């Protein structure tokens, strides 16, 4: 598929301190956060003018789903716009608390685990053709997804009975099976629940729930662009070596705990291979595929270059090669500098605080954003583009239709209902348009609906 629809959903961790002590429950904090949303949307599950969906997920986790994007950099921009939308809600909620005499600070974390060991996710969505055999897609993709954490993980300090250690992935500990239709109870690598949000005869939606939430724009870019390339190879029937793992769930944990990328995991055919070996295999195939099909674009070259440097950095233990571009490395360098300066062990509470503060989305407080201000991290988008994406949908996908419809309905104060595929005016005629093609950004039926308001 030369043109693909992408989407990212991020759940955010919420906490509130009251003069340093937690006072409000996550449920109460979530209510404060979403009060503004509920006042105009009459619900804590709304679609926005930029085509995105914002809602309160299970367990009081705010979740932001980007609009449909057909370009990876645009996707990164809209993912960041989600952070800004939530940061706006946070500032508004803090002001409300203050007005009510509650001296509280609200924190929103774009990470995947809280101190109690609960996990929440970052889900990637890739539109794939209905034509192929899904089981083959999963077979080829799972070894890639299990091992890619060594280049796209967000990093985490893990407390173990033997002391603290650094893991490359936050999410790996919480994945329990390879392919499944559940997302919460038994967390799989690929979720198969068949909701394409598109013409089900043509498409299905690949729902990858194994990834970490990334702060780094370049890491998100690599995560999505590399997966897209692997999908393209599968779709075009490129012959891949059988890298099926004997036990992918054990492998994902073992790989996460090994920052050298060298730990061998057992494959189903009895061979052993490391995360570096397996990723190198996919990278070599991808480079060859891009050259042979003449698919090269600046973005693909940037992704392949970072993929290669990421593997080289891990293999040679020369993390400086990617210490501005890969989340787990950026964070590790930050932690190591702080430890050296203050003479602290990895298990010290101040280091755990640092680990968490990296994911704070408040731009005046979060450590990732302090690094960004100093020019210490690489970027793929700009603050201006992110600001625009808070209110302007992608112009080349169905999100444009949804965004335009919502904008006009709100301006005209009309009652409406939307989801990913339906646009409905709640008037006497109950006019509804079904938009089954996510690639279609112009539709006369929608235009008539908008003009008729």
UniProtKB/Swiss-Prot annotation:
Pfam family, one: Pup_ligase
Binding site for ATP: 53, 66, 420
Active site, UniProt feature: 57
Keyword set, alphabetical order: ATP-binding, Ligase, Magnesium, Metal-binding, Nucleotide-binding, Ubl conjugation pathway
Gene Ontology molecular functions: ATP binding; ligase activity, forming carbon-nitrogen bonds; magnesium ion binding; ubiquitin-like protein transferase activity
Enzyme Commission no: 6.3.1.19
Functional pathway: Protein degradation; proteasomal Pup-dependent pathway; Protein modification; protein pupylation
GO biological process: modification-dependent protein catabolic process; proteasomal protein catabolic process; protein pupylation
Binding site for Mg(2+): 9, 55, 63
Catalytic activity from the UniProt record: ATP + [prokaryotic ubiquitin-like protein]-L-glutamate + [protein]-L-lysine = ADP + phosphate + N(6)-([prokaryotic ubiquitin-like protein]-gamma-L-glutamyl)-[protein]-L-lysine
NCBIfam families named among the record's database cross-references: pupylate_PafA
PANTHER family found in the cross-reference section: PUP DEAMIDASE/DEPUPYLASE (PTHR42307), PUP--PROTEIN LIGASE (PTHR42307:SF3)
Job of this protein: Catalyzes the covalent attachment of the prokaryotic ubiquitin-like protein modifier Pup to the proteasomal substrate proteins, thereby targeting them for proteasomal degradation. This tagging system is termed pupylation. The ligation reaction involves the side-chain carboxylate of the C-terminal glutamate of Pup and the side-chain amino group of a substrate lysine.
Family named by the database record: Belongs to the Pup ligase/Pup deamidase family. Pup-conjugating enzyme subfamily.
Miscellaneous field: The reaction mechanism probably proceeds via the activation of Pup by phosphorylation of its C-terminal glutamate, which is then subject to nucleophilic attack by the substrate lysine, resulting in an isopeptide bond and the release of phosphate as a good leaving group.
Name of this protein: Pup--protein ligase
Organism: Nocardioides sp. (strain ATCC BAA-499 / JS614)
Organismal lineage: Bacteria, Bacillati, Actinomycetota, Actinomycetes, Propionibacteriales
């Amino acid at each position: 598929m030369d043109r693909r629809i992408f989407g990212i959903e991020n759940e955010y961790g919420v906490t509130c301190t009251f003069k340093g002590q937690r006072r409000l429950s996550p449920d109460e904090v979530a209510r404060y956060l979403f009060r503004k949303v509920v006042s105009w949307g009459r619900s804590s599950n709304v679609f926005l003018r930029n085509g995105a969906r914002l809602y309160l997920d299970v367990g009081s986790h705010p979740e932001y789903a980007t609009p449909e994007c057909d370009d990876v950099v645009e996707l990164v921009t809209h993912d960041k716009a989600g952070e800004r939308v939530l940061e706006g809600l946070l500032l508004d909620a803090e002001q409300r608390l203050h007005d009510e005499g509650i001296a509280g600070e609200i924190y929103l974390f774009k990470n995947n685990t809280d101190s109690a060991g609960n996990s929440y996710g970052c889900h990637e969505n890739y539109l794939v053709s209905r034509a192929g055999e899904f089981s083959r897609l999963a077979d080829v993709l799972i070894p890639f997804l299990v091992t890619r954490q060594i280049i796209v993980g967000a990093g985490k300090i893990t407390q173990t009975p033997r002391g603290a250690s650094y893991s490359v992935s936050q999410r790996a500990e919480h994945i329990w099976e390879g392919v499944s239709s559940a997302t919460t109870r038994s967390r799989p690598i690929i979720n198969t629940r068949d909701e394409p949000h598109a013409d089900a005869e043509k498409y299905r939606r690949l729902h990858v729930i194994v990834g970490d939430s990334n702060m780094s724009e370049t890491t998100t870019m690599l995560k999505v662009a590399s997966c897209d390339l692997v999908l393209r190879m599968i779709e075009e029937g490129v012959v891949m070596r059988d890298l099926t793992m004997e036990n992918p769930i054990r492998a994902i944990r073992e790989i996460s705990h090994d920052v050298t990328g060298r730990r061998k995991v057992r494959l189903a055919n009895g061979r052993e291979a490391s995360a570096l070996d397996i990723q190198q295999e996919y990278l070599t195939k991808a480079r060859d595929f891009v050259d042979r099909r003449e698919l090269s674009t600046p973005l693909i070259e940037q992704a392949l270059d970072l993929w290669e440097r990421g593997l080289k950095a891990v293999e040679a233990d020369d993390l400086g090669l990617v210490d501005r571009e890969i989340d787990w490395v950026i964070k590790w360098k930050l932690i190591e500098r702080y430890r050296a300066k203050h003479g602290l062990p990895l298990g010290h509470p101040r280091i755990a605080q640092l680990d968490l503060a990296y994911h704070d989305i408040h731009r005046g407080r979060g450590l990732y954003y302090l690094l960004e201000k100093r020019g210490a991290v690489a970027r793929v988008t700009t603050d201006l583009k992110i600001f625009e994406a808070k209110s302007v949908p992608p112009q080349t996908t169905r999100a444009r239709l949804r965004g335009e419809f919502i904008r006009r309905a709100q301006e005209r104060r009309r009652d409406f209902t939307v989801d990913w595929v339906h646009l409905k005016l709640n008037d006497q005629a109950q006019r509804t348009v079904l938009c089954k093609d996510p690639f279609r950004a112009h539709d006369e039926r929608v235009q008539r609906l908008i003009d008729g308001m």
